[in-house]
Amino acid sequence: VAHGTDSDNTFALSSTGLVLDSRVNITRTGLTTLTLDGLAGDDTFTIGSDHGYATVNVDGGSPSNTDVATITADGLNPVTVTLGTSPVSTTDATVANTGIGTVTLSGVEVANVVAGTQNVTVNGSGEDDDLTYQPTGAEAGTVTKAGLGVVTNLSGVGDLTIDGIGGDDTLTVVGTTAVDAFTVTATSVVHASLQDANTISNVDALSVSGGESADTFGVTAGAIPIFIDGGDAIGAGDAITIAADVNSATFNTGPETDEGSFAIGGAAGLVSFDHVESLTVVGTSVAGNAATVNGNSADNDITLTATGTDDFTVGIDGQTVTFTDFNS
């Protein structure tokens, strides 16, 4: 065990040993587990690969502000981040990789995980996890869990997998203040220029929030409900394009002109939305492409306008839905 002090301490672990506050060099001899105890203060932990320990326990202690751990994987093998339970957990998260072994984090508010262009899996827990992922760069993103004190910043990511593991889990993918273009399914959220959530599994509900600017969402319905929040309307506003393929589409208007939902064919999950100004549903001009439009409890004013062969728009109380390649 390497103890810090009640002041701010800096721990640096690498293949050459452990350095504490740039002055104490501790060399490993026949040990498999190392504990770094920051005690009080705002401590910094830097952990590199090939340090020789199977397990490194990082305890940030009681911070006056923030304890930060930066963990750099070997750049050769995948990385797995497992989030702890909330609100009380002896372990906030673990980070595992062949080159670093298993790093457990307790009392650490910020975990920076550098994957070296390798694939990263972020696992939830067996409880009901409320997860949020925000892409921040071409190979970077941030994952948080409601009720858990650690913010996990990922960089150098190859493919990203987010797995809820167990419980009734939700995932929210958050865009930026700039223009975002998302391709959304029940099992992935792809961003046009930032790090994707390439694989999503064991999640019971998915939300995608565009934030500010005029964002676009290409959506395919699936086994779980998908909610799209366009955010504040800028310019032409936010747009959803629903891929119906060979299926029917039922549109349910909402209480406001920028909200409602779609049921697509036999997909179990509704696609619902709010703060979205442009709505398009695309079929394939087959017999199964039948459109149904449902009003709400108000006195609805519905207008059907043909725009081409198998193409038409339906206006309902100021809200317009464009159906393309729908034959009825």
What are these regions (language model features)?
Residues V1-S328:
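Acidic, glycine-rich low-complexity segments
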